[in-house]
């Protein structure tokens, strides 16, 4: 149950599960940290976002959400793939360890090595996202 006036931290297994309750919340989503899930979250009006780094990948492909969301003005971070299961938002929230974050998240106190829970709580301070992401 949502508490009026309190920013909610919502774990989801996939960005495809985004619903109307996502707006203004901090989401911890078990999806890869690429532009697709980031765009869906931005369109949903998420306050801040934590995704899975899925092992980072070649040329940092698993982190492309971070600069994308930085440009839009949304704090975001990724958890280390070795710390929590992919596609399991609750596991990420409980056991996840931050591997990377964008400058906006860093400015709120988020840093590599921090627990996902602590990072999510810090991101509750973020200004609600009100941008209009480009669908391209």
Predicted regions: what is each one?
Residues 1-135:
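Residues that scaffold, gate, or flank divalent-cation-dependent active/transport sites
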């Amino acid at each position: 149950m949502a508490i009026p006036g309190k920013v909610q931290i919502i774990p989801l297994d996939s960005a495809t599960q985004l619903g109307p309750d996502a707006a203004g919340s901090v989401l911890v989503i078990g999806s890869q940290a690429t532009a697709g899930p980031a765009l869906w979250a931005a369109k949903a009006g998420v306050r801040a976002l934590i995704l899975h780094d899925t092992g980072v990948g070649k040329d940092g492909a698993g982190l492309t959400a971070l600069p994308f969301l930085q440009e839009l003005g949304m704090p975001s971070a990724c958890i280390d793939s070795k710390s929590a299961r992919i596609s399991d938002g609750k596991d990420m929230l409980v056991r996840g360890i931050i591997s990377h974050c964008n400058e906006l998240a860093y400015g709120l106190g988020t840093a590599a090595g921090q627990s996902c829970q602590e990072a999510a709580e810090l991101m509750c301070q973020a200004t609600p996202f009100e941008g209009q992401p480009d669908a391209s």
